[in-house]
C-alpha cells in the first residue's frame, strides 16, 4: 500500500548464506512474512496459533516448519538436517506477539538451539509492524512505517554475551532491547504517520479546537 513506507537496514550486509539462528521481536503476523523475505533458506519455529491458523497453518506445515509444542529436544535432529541443507532457523524468542509494542521477556529456546547446533545468532529488530497491523485488529491496516534492522551476527562461541545459553538469553535480550529503544527514539516522531495519528488521537475527544491546533502545530514543525 502507498501509505506504508518500508525501510531496511542491514548493518553488515548479511546474506544468510551461512546457516544461523535468527531471532526477532514480535509485533504482528506480518513479522513472519518479513523474516521469510530475507532469504529462501529460512524455516521457522512457530507457536500453536500460527500452526493452527486457517490462513498460514497448512502452508507452514507443508513448508516443513517446526512447532514449538513439539519441544526443542525432540526437534533437534530434524533441525540439524535442515541446517546441513543450508537453512537458517527463525524464532521469536518472546513467544507471542506484543500488544503494546514493548519487547517482552525472552524464552531460552533459541539460545539453547544455538548452543546445541553450534549456530551463530542473527538478531533482527522489527519496528512499526504492530502499528500497521495490530494484534488486537489483525484485519485493519493503518498508515505507518515497516522498519527492519539486521544487527551483526553473534558467533556461537562469542563469550562476550555469556558462556551458557541461559546467560546469553539475558544478555542478548538486553542488547536487543537497548537497540530497539534507540530505533523508537528515532522513529517515534510526527514524521511517522502511525505516531502522528496516535498523537492526534490523544487529543481528539478533548476539544475540536485542541485537535485542530495539534494537527496544525505538528505539521508546521515537521
Residue spans for each PLM region:
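A transmembrane-helix-recognition feature enriched in membrane-embedded lipid enzymes
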Residues: 1-9, 55-59, 202, 208, ...
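Catalytic core of membrane glycerolipid acyltransferases/transacylases, capturing the structured
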Residues: 2, 17-71
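Secondary-structure boundary/capping positions in well-ordered alpha/beta enzyme cores
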Residues: 7, 41-42, 66, 86, ...
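Short acidic-hydrophobic, aromatic-tinged amphipathic segments that line or gate anion-handling sites
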Residues: 8-9, 66-70, 156
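Glycine-rich helix-loop-beta junction characteristic of Rossmann-like nucleotide cofactor-binding loops
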Residues: 10-15
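Non-catalytic C-terminal accessory region of glycerolipid acyltransferases
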Residues: 75-222
